[in-house]
A protein has these predicted regions:
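Bacterial N-terminal signal peptides
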Residues: 3, 7-20
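Active-site regions of metal-assisted phosphoester/phosphodiester hydrolases
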Residues: 13, 151, 166
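Cleavable N-terminal signal peptides
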Residues: 14-15, 25, 37
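N-terminal segment of the mature folded domain
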Residues: 28-156
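Bilobed "Venus flytrap"/periplasmic-binding protein-like clamshell domains
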Residues: 39-45, 154-183
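A short secondary-structure junction signal
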Residues: 137-138, 160-164, 227-229
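Ligand-binding pocket segment of bilobal, Venus flytrap-like solute-binding proteins
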Residues: 175-230
Length: 230
């Protein structure tokens, strides 16, 4: 497993009904956090800790419910009417889409919380089969021989877009900005993807449980989860 691109921001913010909105907490005992695929385990623990802290500080009980899926798909669900109280998505553009198409979030959302409303970061890694039989160590190895790649669909998954951008960044450096070579590399990479799941968790299942592909492109925490679960 090789780290390839660090410092990827994950953006989070409160919608108009969230606990951070003045006067809303007293009337609300349930919150819905609409998040992307890989945060299930994170927020399961975080929500429990938050509920205890909120109870200690205010005397009120709060229940936090979760909705998970590809980041872009989740943004579309909120735009189409899913009543989220908080969204924690993988891309700034997904939150900006909610701003532009629903009016549920203020345009200046990035300035509302510290670190441009990006509370944590992650990185993209390669997860390979035991013993690394295809000898995959870097981006160039992904387009050698008969290597098959598992990655989500960048049209619906935030993590998939980071995978795409990481591949593009590597190719840009490798080919010294030659756009034709960069496009050819990225195109060849995606030709080697036998399936494009809508979200990163689906890709993890495809690789680890269904045993499809030689390498999984994933968030670092998702790679660790695959090792523990499968």
């Amino acid at each position: 497993m090789s780290k390839l691109l660090s410092g990827l921001s994950v953006v989070a913010l409160s919608l108009s009904l969230a606990l951070g909105a003045a006067g809303s907490a007293a009337a609300q005992t349930k919150l819905l956090n609409v998040s992307y695929d890989q945060t299930r385990e994170l927020y399961k623990d975080f929500n429990e800790a938050f509920a205890k802290k909120w109870k200690a500080d205010t005397g009120e009980d709060v229940t936090i419910q979760q909705s998970h899926g590809g980041s872009g798909k989740q943004a579309r669900s909120v735009i189409d009417g899913l009543e989220a109280d908080v969204v924690t998505l993988a891309l700034q553009s997904d939150i900006d889409a909610i701003v532009q198409n629903s009016g549920k979030i203020n345009k200046d959302w990035r300035g509302r919380l510290p670190h441009n409303s990006s509370p944590y970061t992650s990185t993209i890694v390669f997860l390979v089969r035991k013993g690394n039989p295809k000898g995959i160590h870097n981006w160039g190895d992904l387009v050698k021989g008969d290597v098959q790649i598992v990655t989500p669909n960048p049209k619906t998954s935030g993590g998939a877009r980071w995978n795409y951008l990481a591949a593009w960044a590597w190719a840009n450096e490798e080919f010294k900005g030659d756009k034709d070579k960069i496009k050819a590399y990225v195109g060849e990479l995606y030709k080697r993807a036998p399936v494009l799941d809508t979200g990163a968790r689906g890709s993890t299942v495809t690789f680890a449980q269904r045993q499809i592909g030689d390498v999984l492109l994933a968030w670092e925490n998702e790679a660790y989860l695959a090792g523990e679960e499968f």
